[in-house]
């Protein structure tokens, strides 16, 4: 007699369909398509956890660059001037200073300009 393994198979398939809850169309109903969609979503999630860090760094650099150009200096010369002056502030903090504390940021620009 053939053993179908009903409850075990059903539980395994239900697990994948539960993970695909909220997906559009047959991806939330059909086992095979749901499993493919979930695995692909995990791939995207892994990739984008890395990508979001790069995106934030780009955002901070563009904010710093815009603020520095108002003072007539390029981003690369500003960063180089800070390094020569032994000022180690990360780009996130520089971006926050440029937005929230423009006076302090302009002092940093002056220091970077003097060190060249």
UniProtKB/Swiss-Prot annotation:
Cross-referenced Pfam families: Ribosomal_L20
Domain of life: Bacteria
Keyword tRNA processing: no
UniProt keyword list: Ribonucleoprotein, Ribosomal protein, RNA-binding, rRNA-binding
GO terms (BP aspect): ribosomal large subunit assembly; translation
Family matches, as Gene3D superfamilies: 6.10.160.10, Ribosomal protein L20
GO molecular function per UniProt: rRNA binding; structural constituent of ribosome
Signal peptide start and end residues: none
GO cellular component, one term: ribosome
Xref: InterPro entries: Ribosomal_bL20 (IPR005813), RIBOSOMAL_L20_CS (IPR049946), Ribosomal_protein_bL20_C (IPR035566)
Coiled-coil regions, chain positions: none
Family: Belongs to the bacterial ribosomal protein bL20 family.
HAMAP family attached to this UniProt entry: Ribosomal_bL20 (MF_00382)
Function: Binds directly to 23S ribosomal RNA and is necessary for the in vitro assembly process of the 50S ribosomal subunit. It is not involved in the protein synthesizing functions of that subunit.
Protein name: Large ribosomal subunit protein bL20
Species whose genome carries this gene: Mycoplasmopsis agalactiae (strain NCTC 10123 / CIP 59.7 / PG2) (Mycoplasma agalactiae)
Taxonomic lineage: Bacteria, Bacillati, Mycoplasmatota, Mycoplasmoidales, Metamycoplasmataceae
Gene name per UniProt: rplT
């Amino acid at each position: 007699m053939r053993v179908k393994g009903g409850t075990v198979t059903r539980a395994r398939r239900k697990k994948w369909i539960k993970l695909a809850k909220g997906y559009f169309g047959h991806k939330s109903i059909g086992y095979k398509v749901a499993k493919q969609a979930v695995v692909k979503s995990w791939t995207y999630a892994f990739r984008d956890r890395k990508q979001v860090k790069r995106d934030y760094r780009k955002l901070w650099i563009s904010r710093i660059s815009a603020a520095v150009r108002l003072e007539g200096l390029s981003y690369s010369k500003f960063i180089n001037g800070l390094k020569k002056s032994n000022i180690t502030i990360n780009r996130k903090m520089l971006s926050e200073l440029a937005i929230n504390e423009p006076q302090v940021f302009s002092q940093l620009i002056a220091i970077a300009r003097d060190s060249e």
